[in-house]
């Protein structure tokens, strides 16, 4: 992994509503702590940090736009006043937002993706990022997945969901990295 230029750090949908039992079991309980490590390094270097905030239109969702607590960012990684937040109501951080034009205006060539959840916003945004021509890095231990039940009523563990989503993104859509690898590389530069 060789990170070119300073990539924009994308922090996707790390909101209190994802702590609701509605989502089921989750993997990577340390994801928010890893995001905080990356945020701290990006802030120290004054690099581009961009958040997305999901405002669901589904009334039963803990992320429904009327659920004021559910849509709030988790305190551990809450944006600072000068950091940009793009609000959205679909899985992709690029749809219905100015994310792409903002990145192009800032001449950002690469992005480092973190956030929740691996099978929703993270995967969808990583795919779109690559398709739009951005060099895309996905921090596998700074993202997390939730268990799902498939069409045959089989429950798939969050670990398996995460593993398969990461595998599907690997090489074709994103370079998969870990928090420690990113931080080590930055210290060497």
Predicted regions and their residues:
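N-terminal nucleotide-binding beta1-loop-alpha1 segment
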Residues: 9-14
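Short, well-ordered beta-to-alpha junction loops that form the rim of enzyme active sites
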Residues: 53-55, 116
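A short acidic, helix-capping loop that chelates divalent metal ions and anchors anionic groups
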Residues: 18-22, 58-61, 147-149
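A short alpha/beta connector and helix-capping loop motif
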Residues: 23-51
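Active-site-adjacent betaalpha module
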Residues: 1-8, 36-40, 44-45, 62-189
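Acidic/histidine-rich helix-loop elements
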Residues: 19-28, 153-155
């Amino acid at each position: 992994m060789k990170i070119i230029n300073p990539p924009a750090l994308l922090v996707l949908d790390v909101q209190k509503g994802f702590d609701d039992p509605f989502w089921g079991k989750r993997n990577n309980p340390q994801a928010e702590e890893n995001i905080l490590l990356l945020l701290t390094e990006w802030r120290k270097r004054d690099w581009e940090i961009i958040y997305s905030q999901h405002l669901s239109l589904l009334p039963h969702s803990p992320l429904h736009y009327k659920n004021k607590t559910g849509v709030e960012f988790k305190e551990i990684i809450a944006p600072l006043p000068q950091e940009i937040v793009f609000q959205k109501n679909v899985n992709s951080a690029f749809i219905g937002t100015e994310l792409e034009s903002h990145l192009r205006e800032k001449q950002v060539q690469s992005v480092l993706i973190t956030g929740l959840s691996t099978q929703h916003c993270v995967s969808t945004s990583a795919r779109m990022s690559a398709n739009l021509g951005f060099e895309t890095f996905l921090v596998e231990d700074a993202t997390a997945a939730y268990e799902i039940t498939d069409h045959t009523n089989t429950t798939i563990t969050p670990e398996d969901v995460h593993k398969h989503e990461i595998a599907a993104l690997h090489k074709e859509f994103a370079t998969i990295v870990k928090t420690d690898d990113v931080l080590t590389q930055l210290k060497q530069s």
